[in-house]
Amino acid sequence: ESKMNKGDSKIMKTVYTCFCTDVIHEGHLNIIEQAHKYGRVVVGALSDEALIRYNRFPTISFDERIRMYQELEGVDEVIVQDTIMYDDVIKKLKPDYVVHGDNWREGAESVIRENVLSLLSEYGGELIEVPYTYNEEVKKIDSTLKEKLAMPEYRRKRLKQLIKMCPVVKTIEAHSGLTGLIAEKTVVEENG
C-alpha cells in the first residue's frame, strides 16, 4: 500500500537516510525535515556491530535507538542497516533519494559517499546533500558523548563488545593521559 502526499495524486517517492547516533540534535532534525520534502522518509538505524566497526560506540541499546528514530516527526519507517556501506539497503529499497549531510565529501567517509553515488547511478536515484549543522549546541552534544565514552565503565563495555564481535582486536597500551589522548585521536586513512 503506497502512501499519498496530502493533496497530491502522485505516489510519494522513497527517501533514505542513515543515522548512527544516540542523541538527536538540530542537524539530524534538519536532515529529516529536508528528506520529508522529497517523499516518504525511511531511516536506517546502523546496527551495533556496524557502529562499533565504524569506531562509534553506542551508549544506548539498539532497540532504544530504533524507538528514538521512530518517534521523530517526519520519519515514516525505520529499518536496520547492518553495514556502514549502503549496498544492501539501496539494492533492496531502491530509494529515489538518499539524503546525507555534506560532511562526508572529504575524509574517511568519502569512500562511502562514492559508493552511494555509484549505487544510485545504476537506476537513476539521486543523492541530496544537506549543509552540515555544526554549531555550539552540536559541539556540546559531541563533547558530552565523548566524555561519557571515556569513562572506564564504557571503555570496558566497548572492549567486551569488540572481543565478542571480532576474533582479533587491535589495542594500544597508553601509560599517561597524553599517550592515551594520542592513541584515541589517531586516525589512519588508507589510499587517501
Question: Which residue stretches match the model-derived regions?
Answer:
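Nucleotidyltransferase catalytic core that binds NTPs
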Residues: 2-153
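N-terminal amphipathic alpha-helix/helix-capping segment at the start of soluble metabolic enzymes
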Residues: 149-188
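Short amphipathic alpha-helices and their capping/turn segments at secondary-structure boundaries
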Residues: 28-37, 180-191
